[in-house]
Amino acid sequence: MTDSKSNSNSPSLSYKDAGVDIDAGNALVERIKSVAKRTRRPEVMAGLGGFGALFELPKGYQEPVLVAGTDGVGTKLKLAMQLNKHDTIGIDLVAMCVNDLIVGGAEPLFFLDYYATGKLSVDVAASVVEGIGAGCELSGCSLVGGETAEMPGMYEGEDYDLAGFCVGIVEKSKILDGSKVAAGDVLLGIPSSGPHSNGYSLIRKVLEVSGASLDDKVGDTTLGQALLEPTRIYVKPLLELFKNVQVNALSHITGGGLLENIPRVLPENTRAQIDCASWELPPVFKWLQEQGNINAVEMYRTFNCGVGMIVCVPAAEAANAIAQLKQSGEDAFEIGKIVAAEGAPEVDLLNL
């Protein structure tokens, strides 16, 4: 039997001695509360601090269907850390989740975040959460909770990782699943703000081989600013569009670019034809292509190339859809069409 008595000559250890500062975590929670309050929807039934968030289903639905999604922002975080700019990366986190939900026709209801770090910096984490709150306000959903994990030894210093989780709601009869897509439908593009939150491992490789500085000019901004521009949130304009226009499908252009994401919402025996000459490649993508010597097909299967969301509508609805989106502040434009084809859906890139 071993002696379980403590060694009186050794110091009394605390959680903080092991690298976990409970007081810092509590201080962060206090700063988060005001952010959560700004995003609060009437269906939220309790504040932060409980073991689980309570949320009442909105009224007015006959057959409500819940839609859930989770995502992160990938290695864009490395650039945020490099530039010590953390106030917009939270917008990216929310955008990646809520833009996926709207593709199914769902209105985002509530959001939770996961923040993991080696050593908690309350100021950095609070800045990130401010961005999350801004993203929730832009998409109309409530920040109802989250988890802050301080894990010394798992992450280097104050480096951190993020994950987001979102739940939305849609009437069963109004789910967008691509089943109504038909030959002759028109594809409309809604502009992105830049690479959004995808392709950053390739972006960082281009930065490495080019030797470029993040202070270099690209278009009318710096390279660093162009690459950290937050992901656009399309939720509110699209929810408004649903009220006035028949939308057959949406495609959120994320990892995999146009080539991989458009087929995800197309039925069998259809294919998308995209006219790449229908919009100009934004400066940051031109820079990446030139400095990385990236071929055109690789560009369109890695990046959004200036189009963050694609809207599929019947041809007769195209002009109305463009007008409605412009009323909501979105400069939508026609980029292609759906044609009949045998087999699994694919994308034809025309005028590359």
From Swiss-Prot:
GO terms for molecular function: ATP binding; phosphoribosylamine-glycine ligase activity; phosphoribosylformylglycinamidine cyclo-ligase activity. It holds the Pfam family AIRS. One of its GO terms (biological process) is adenine biosynthetic process. Keywords: ATP-binding, Cytoplasm, Ligase, Nucleotide-binding, Purine biosynthesis. It is found in: Cytoplasm. Its EC number is 6.3.3.1. It comes from the Bacteria. Pathway: Purine metabolism; IMP biosynthesis via de novo pathway; 5-amino-1-(5-phospho-D-ribosyl)imidazole from N(2)-formyl-N(1)-(5-phospho-D-ribosyl)glycinamide: step 2/2. It catalyses: 2-formamido-N(1)-(5-O-phospho-beta-D-ribosyl)acetamidine + ATP = 5-amino-1-(5-phospho-beta-D-ribosyl)imidazole + ADP + phosphate + H(+). Its main location: cytoplasm. GO terms for cellular component: cytosol. InterPro entries: PurM-like_C_dom, PurM-like_C_sf, PurM-like_N, PurM-like_N_sf, PurM_cligase. It is an enzyme of class 6 (ligase). Belongs to the AIR synthase family. This is Phosphoribosylformylglycinamidine cyclo-ligase. It comes from Saccharophagus degradans (strain 2-40 / ATCC 43961 / DSM 17024).
